[in-house]
Amino acid sequence: MMLSWKQLILLSFIGCLAGELLLQGPVFIKEPSNSIFPVDSEDKKITLNCEARGNPSPHYRWQLNGSDIDTSLDHRYKLNGGNLIVINPNRNWDTGSYQCFATNSLGTIVSREAKLQFAYLENFKTRMRSTVSVREGQGVVLLCGPPPHSGELSYAWVFNEYPSFVEEDSRRFVSQETGHLYIAKVEPSDVGNYTCVVTSTVTNTRVLGSPTPLVLRSDGVMGEYEPKIEVQFPETLPAAKGSTVRLECFALGNPVPQINWRRSDGMPFPNKIKLRKFNGMLEIQNFQQEDTGSYECIAENSRGKNVARGRLTYYAKPYWLQLLRDVEIAVEDSLYWECRASGKPKPSYRWLKNGDALVLEERIQIENGALTITNLNVTDSGMFQCIAENKHGLIYSSAELKVVASAPDFSRNPMKKMVQVQVGSLVILDCKPRASPRALSFWKKGDMMVREQARVSFLNDGGLKIMNVTKADAGTYTCTAENQFGKANGTTHLVVTEPTRIILAPSNMDVAVGESVILPCQVQHDPLLDIMFAWYFNGALTDFKKDGSHFEKVGGSSSGDLMIRNIQLKHSGKYVCMVQTGVDSVSSAAELIVRGSPGPPENVKVDEITDTTAQLSWTEGTDSHSPVISYAVQARTPFSVGWQSVRTVPEVIDGKTHTATVVELNPWVEYEFRIVASNKIGGGEPSLPSEKVRTEEAAPEIAPSEVSGGGGSRSELVITWDPVPEELQNGGGFGYVVAFRPLGVTTWIQTVVTSPDNPRYVFRNESIVPFSPYEVKVGVYNNKGEGPFSPVTTVFSAEEEPTVAPSHISAHSLSSSEIEVSWNTIPWKLSNGHLLGYEVRYWNNGGEEESSRKVKVAGNQTSAVLRGLKSNLAYYTAVRAYNSAGAGPFSATVNATTKKTPPSQPPGNVVWNATDTKVLLNWEQVKAMENESEVTGYKVFYRTSSQNNVHVLNTNKTSAELLLPIKEDYIIEVKATTDGGDGTSSEQIRIPRITSMDARGSTSAISNIHPLSGYMSVLLFFIVNALW
């Protein structure tokens, strides 16, 4: 079809405008929705939303019930953008269906219909309601009769006074369909006034009707009668897809009927069906087509039953299966536009263009909802809407049709500047300019026209295909495209390269865990091409940064060798080297088998258990590419430290055996078992533990150890032992058999200790002789029988305290603070046990016996030294023996007086003189005071300054002569000696090592020490009889 010059100018203008501004028809962002407005609302306006995008920006208008709303004339309506605001809404004028129209230069679209309704609830008429009189046991219905209203209501009833509401149960029911109150069987407690309460669910307004008095008749009680269904659902009830359906059913009767529900076809109810209000209501949520059918309500009591039936039918508003999409198409082409919707009943279709019904003509036809327009022209452009509707609703789908006319243009889809291919391949050179209608294309290589031949062909979309490319095909190709509105051309340079080849490919390898390998991948390629290597492991691209601890790419520019370090089992698999250039790609694969220690065996089970054996079975785990050679069994109990190897039959379990018997188990112990597999590489991870099992019981085999005893109280024989560990008790009911007899008697006395943890038994009998020997043995038993006894050992009965006192007690003073006490031991036969020692009690002349102090000596000692005593004072003392049972009687009392204290005056004016061989000491005589011991002599204490070993020289003179052969300083002290001990020490004298021929000093001039010379030795002129 030829277009006029005016159309060409218009097309040209539209094309430029479209390129600059990207024009777009209106598309709704927000559409109005159904709205219910409370009449008594404090908000005095309603806003209906409408917003669309488009370029240029759309403008808006509205219709009410198909008539335009003129906002310039009616000031109750205002536009805010696309939103319509209704001021002071009136239910008489503003109720109806609203639609929004959005328009720009490309067309108009119409919104969905939005219904505006007004909700209100008027008051009940003020009139008295008649009294309802019934017999006790009779059913009754109290009518509500709601006042005029609009909008959904809910119902309740007040009993006597507000807000005491009637509680619904199996006897009382409030219908939310009619508002009536149903009482299945009236009782005396029901007498009173009943008021219907109606609430608007929209406005939340509540109104109360007039009270209805309910009284009991006095002419008797109603007898029993079968149920009478008063509340039932319609015989046919349409239900919308996705809605919530509620069916009510309630019956009067005496006794109170029970309500049950079922489907007539016997199918069970799905979980989404709920029974509410004591079965008086059946609720189906999210109603779907499979929920249709006949439902039955059965009311039943002891007098009979009645059934109400109704059928639920399914309907669905239209919903889209296929929406319209914007179409841009060239002039003179044909359009086939399909919109598809579903619903029940099946929807019908109609089309709008720019908000008006589409006018059909020879070119424009609608069939089954699909729109066909042939021989398109620019005037067909606009906004189209498909409407699908049935009696339950309608839906809109909108799209823009752009009919374009333009000369070929490569600006939006330019040809590639260069195409690289390899020798022998196939190449397609694209030529796809934007053109309406589609352009015709022809090709040139350089200045020569390209003609079709065996290897060269032209494609329908204008492209050029060349097969089995050769080097001669390289060059510059130009495509010229032309239609009735003009022509344009584009150029592509074709580069032909040599193919890439892998000259050193990876090969299959077999390695052990921990090794490192290199998989080679070296290529030969066209030098004009850049090359890139990639490695795939089991189909996944190797990330050398993430997996750098194991994988590294090595080699030169033409090499992509893969190094794998410290190979693990997880690295087994297929490796592919992928080599890619700008024109081709090649690859080579290799299998890498990694052999390692086997994986853990699986499904470890205990098939049979006895008292000392367990039959095990398991299945083989992964062999890590190295066959399993052997298996080992390990066990664990609550008493073991970790897992322990156990003996099995067979003793060596080869890799093909998956059963074994564990032997030498302890009876009545809970065991877990696991299996460890080994191959040439080494031992693998152990299996998961088996379930815990307990071996069967057996008679005990281990006797208690460390059987001994002794001690205890008078007339007792105490026997002790180490308890048998739980893991060696071999069964439940474990205890001990204790056997004993006096030494020399043949008959055993036996008793039982039932506690397995008890380590002792005490036998009490007044006839037991103290510290008499008994033969003792301890055996074991459990539910399965008795076990062995321990070896016989001798245990002594309990001791008694000694009955005699030590004899020949004597005491004498050793010094001013010490007295020695001595005695004779008591005979063994009179000790009544093993004698532990003696206790010495003592007190001074001025003290009381009750305040005496004690000293104990162990064993058979026959003397003790009392220390820390006061000087020149008489002390009294007595001795008694003791054993483990206690102490015996004290001996007779003896006494001794401590000696006087040593002199408190130290030796004074100690003077020393030294020659080359001698040191002479002199000091003043010490005189004792009247209360001090007389001086009997003196002690000279001396040592080298570098040692603590002190030597003592006794003398009865006030002088001493020494040879000092050691080349060290000496420290010297002098003390007086008496019967009462040593006196106070003189001041220390330091004699320096001798370095000169003559030296002297004294305690009064110790600081003036002269150095001594020569080799020093000590010559003792008196007998050394003590060390200090």
Swiss-Prot record:
Glycosylation sites: N65, N193, N377, N468, N489, N765, N860, N895, N913, N931, N956
Record's subcellular location: Cell membrane
Chief site of localization: membrane
Sequence ranges assigned to domain Ig-like C2-type in this UniProt record: 32-117, 122-209, 227-313, 318-402, 408-497, 499-593
Disulfide bond sites: C50-C100, C144-C196, C249-C297, C339-C386, C431-C479, C521-C577
Superkingdom to which the source organism belongs: Eukaryota
Subunit structure, interactors included: Interacts with PTPRG.
Record-stated family: Belongs to the immunoglobulin superfamily. Contactin family.
Protein name: Contactin-3
Species of provenance: Mus musculus (Mouse)
Protein encoded by which gene: Cntn3
